[in-house]
Amino acid sequence: MKRQAEATKRKHQVSSDAPPAKRRSEISSVLAKKASDKETQRTFKGSTHKTFPPKKYLDSIGNGRQEEKPCIKTSSLFKNNPEIPELHSTVVKQAREQVFSPEAFQELDLHPHLISTINTVLKMSSMTSVQKQSIPVLLEGRDALVRSQTGSGKTLAYCVPVVQSLQALTSKIQRSDGPYALVLVPTRELALQSFDTVQKLLKPFTWIVPGVLMGGEKRKSEKARLRKGINILISTPGRLVDHIKSTKNLHFNRIRWLIVDEADRILDLGFEKDITVILNAVNAECQKRQNVLLSATLTEGVTRLVDISLHNPVSISVLDKNCNQPNPKEVASIQLNSFAIPESLDQHVVLVPSKLRLVCLAAFILQKCKFEKNQKMIVFFSSCELVEFHYSLFLHTLLCHSGTPTSEHLPSASWPLKFLRLHGNMEQEERTSVFHEFSHSETGVLLCTDVASRGLDLPQVTWIVQYSAPSSPAEYIHRIGRTARIGCHGSSLLILAPSEAEYVNSLASHKINVGEIKMEDILAVLAKDDCFKRRQRGAQKSRASGPQEIRERATVLQTVFEDYVHSSQRMVSWAKKALQSFIRAYATYPKELKSIFHVRALHLGHVAKSFGLRDAPRNLSVSAVKKASLKRPHPRRKTQRKQHLVPAEVLHSEHSSGLEGGATKCRKQGKQQGLQVAPSKPGPWRE
């Protein structure tokens, strides 16, 4: 009894010495927070994130209104990252071409009205080097294989001879005669661009009618135009093959010109069979004609096409300053490992850990397009899903933070951001609208797939950013070729992970030099904008400075992205789909680059961070994605897919005729090449 009384007394003493209940609650809260922070740091591998109770904060307008907002603990962007290696690439002598020549168009034997149109409408007086070498040869009626750097004026090099020869025919061309010239191009956008150039050249010669055929347009309308008559026909291969098989009014008995522009790209996209069908159809009705093949790069596939389409051709290469080469095969084999790059093009590379890729890309866009005047940028991605995801993400985050500058370090004004997108899953009407809008815009950021990498002349593009590394040096050349066109200055940036640094040496082996930009220099732009300054409790600004401040602002920007992605289950699902698309595209690099871009080298948790995901999806693993991407479709279900095509599938590929699903076409091409291609896997062009 006595012991029980003493125990009760000690209990009351402890109780009387303890702090009040409110104080005890605060102490326990602080201890719990510290324990939570330690646990989060200890278990961080992209899998543990703590959610804190709601707290009050002042809104951005500053009107004193208080709201409840959950504070989510995000893992550090600057911890557990792989070490960034030093680049020790060998400096090589790049192949150069002289873009302009001193000769003017007046020196050529052209119709005076055609020369006047070139000078006044196209605003060109002097020829480029490739035009100087090509136009006289083509006016002589010779077949030709033309190779020159991107942006050197190859389109005009064949358009001028075609218009000159057709207007000079003694018997005046009638619209009802049908095609006299056939031009094949790989993409719809290039078809529109070539059609626009021909249309301008034909202003003095109204009796010659140009026309364009491409997937995505109404086949009935195209049949009506063919019935009325088209004298210069520009088309994508898939659509033309469809009309050859189904349109009775399409005849080639008067064909005098057959031109294949971007010949290597047409073959890369699997159109070799379509080209064979077209050549057979033309040969069946007209044996005598002039054939021209053009491209910025020559491949082994082009040499095969030379064998079946050209007769005693002239090889024109500005790079080697050789004309009238007797054997185009030898020229092609010599030039396979070297590429001509415009002298006015500056090339850069930056090594960025996977977790920081998204923040680094956003910071670079802000640096060039918000804080610098008259900047126009194209960002290349590996798939349509990546384009759509980043377009939506930047549209709802960066635009909301690109208002009036508040920092004293800002220039007198910042420039509004404008985002556009272009890829093969868009409807043709929207693609055409975006193409024209970006072409006529002075500023803007175009997010796109490789559909925009070939032949397109997009004026005043100052920066090319390759967020997804190209699958070949030739693809790299065509991407950066969208800038520094016709003597203008331009720059390019290639974003690589530390494990991909060896790709720089791969480019150097093809005589391509790139200079390194440090990631810290790109992220430093965030110090110019107080929108990304971290705020502590009580709406007090962080007092950090230097590198620490930049890290804090990068974390704030990453938090903005993650908050948007996790704002709805739909966005989370969209981010996961984009992540899966990225990994599948990553698995399609050719075998010679597998040692650099191997899917097993990816840290899925870190890669997920670059998609605004706080956790790597549990049902996503490297082996699962690889297995799904290589899985062959069930033979019994193949027929059902053909019978139940939805409208979205009809317009799946920018290169198709528009009458069959892109996935079905990929599978057909895969069978011809002995490959196993799944419906959801990106094609060999990874668009």
UniProtKB/Swiss-Prot annotation:
GO terms for molecular function: ATP binding; ATP hydrolysis activity; RNA binding; RNA helicase activity. One of its GO terms (cellular component) is nucleolus. Signal peptide: none annotated. ATP binds at residues 148-155. Residues 1-63, 625-687 are annotated as: Disordered. It is found in: Nucleus, Nucleolus. Keywords: ATP-binding, Helicase, Hydrolase, Isomerase, Nucleotide-binding, Nucleus, RNA-binding. SUPFAM superfamilies: P-loop containing nucleoside triphosphate hydrolases. A motif (DEAD box) lies at residues 261-264. Residues 135-316 form the Helicase ATP-binding domain. Residues 628-644 have a biased composition (Basic residues). Its EC number is 5.6.2.-, 3.6.4.13. Residues 344-523 form the Helicase C-terminal domain. It comes from the Eukaryota. GO terms for biological process: ribosome biogenesis. A motif (Q motif) lies at residues 103-132. Interacts with NPM1; the interaction prevents interaction between NPM1 and HDM2. Belongs to the DEAD box helicase family. DDX31/DBP7 subfamily. May have DNA helicase activity and RNA helicase activity. Probably have ssDNA and RNA dependent ATPase activity. Plays a role in ribosome biogenesis and TP53/p53 regulation through its interaction with NPM1. This is ATP-dependent DNA helicase DDX31. The gene is Ddx31.
